[in-house]
Structure formats: structure tokens, C-alpha cells
């Protein structure tokens, strides 16, 4: 089995995530895409981060209905910072007959050399990279150039930052997130001003 690992804060998961995951799955013939919400992302500030149980629940609602997508809680179940290399070690030990690939935005690839143990990550899995607005097109560090495949996913100007800002401003987020996620955000009153 070939599986794409799609990690992120998913704060919240939105339709661009869905489009990227499906395009990557189709283009590279992946059997499944495992969505991995980061419990404690090392490169993101926690000031706007919804509680991990909310982000996990929203991600589950995002993938329902697509049998090739599943949510993997490996980082949620682990204490401490969510380092990709540790996630790969665990998943490769648990699933020795599965071929994994790491799905990354081009913005993440731009700073990949700064990640925790990037050489080990590159030894463990190939990268499938999708373009993010404003990111550099090429691999910044030549050590990783042979491990990168590029996805032909459309560049979508939707981000979790935009969704949260619209929500704080009292504006609609309909069609930016799946309807089940929008309902969850409303029910749990997420991303509202704290004043």
C-alpha cells in the first residue's frame, strides 16, 4: 500500500486542503492519504491554535465521505512537540509493508532544512510538494532535490489564517471550509474574538 502523509495544524481544515489531498492522491496513485493533525506544531505560534481535540474533530469531519482519506491521530496521542521524524519512525514501525510519502506545501519545503532531523526525514520518505502562494518554486537545499516530486494541484488563496480572520470579523466562512466543519466551528464558537 502507498500512503501520502498530510500533516498540518488544520486550524481549521479547509477546502484547499481537500483539493490538494485529492489531486496528490490521484496524480501519484496513492492508495490513501492520512491526515495527521499536529498536536503541538514546532513552527506555529499557539496564540490562535484551537485545542487539539477541536482540530482533530474538524479534520475527521473534513475527510468523511472519501474512503481514500483517513485521520491518523499519532501526533495527538504523543506528548510534546509534533516532530515529523518521530511520526515517521512510529508509522514505519507500525506499518512496515506500507510505502509512505510526505505531502508538503512549498512554503514548508522552503524551510525544510530548519526542521528537526531533516536528513533522516529525507532518508525515510520521498516528498510530494504542492505550491503555496508566495513560496519559492525550487528546493532551497540541494541535499533534498532528489527526494522531491511536484504535484499539479491548483494554487488556492485559502488559508486557515484567512478563515480565522473572517470568523473573528463576523464574516461568512461558508464554502471556505466543508459544511460539517463550519457547523462544528459554529457549535463550539471557535475563532471568535476573545474580548
Curated annotation (Swiss-Prot):
GO molecular function, one term: ATP binding
Key words, A-Z: ATP-binding, NAD, Nucleotide-binding, Nucleotidyltransferase, Pyridine nucleotide biosynthesis, Transferase
Entry EC number(s): 2.7.7.18
Catalytic activity: nicotinate beta-D-ribonucleotide + ATP + H(+) = deamido-NAD(+) + diphosphate
InterPro entries found in the cross-reference section: Cyt_trans-like, NadD/NMNAT, Rossmann-like_a/b/a_fold
Domain of life of the native organism: Bacteria
Xref: Gene3D superfamilies: HUPs (3.40.50.620)
Pathway in which this enzyme or protein is active: Cofactor biosynthesis; NAD(+) biosynthesis; deamido-NAD(+) from nicotinate D-ribonucleotide: step 1/1
PANTHER family: NICOTINATE-NUCLEOTIDE ADENYLYLTRANSFERASE-RELATED, PHOSPHOPANTETHEINE ADENYLYLTRANSFERASE
UniProt function note: Catalyzes the reversible adenylation of nicotinate mononucleotide (NaMN) to nicotinic acid adenine dinucleotide (NaAD).
Membership in a protein family: Belongs to the NadD family.
NCBIfam families documented for this protein: cyt_tran_rel, nicotinate (nicotinamide) nucleotide adenylyltransferase, PRK00071.1-3
Name of the protein: Probable nicotinate-nucleotide adenylyltransferase
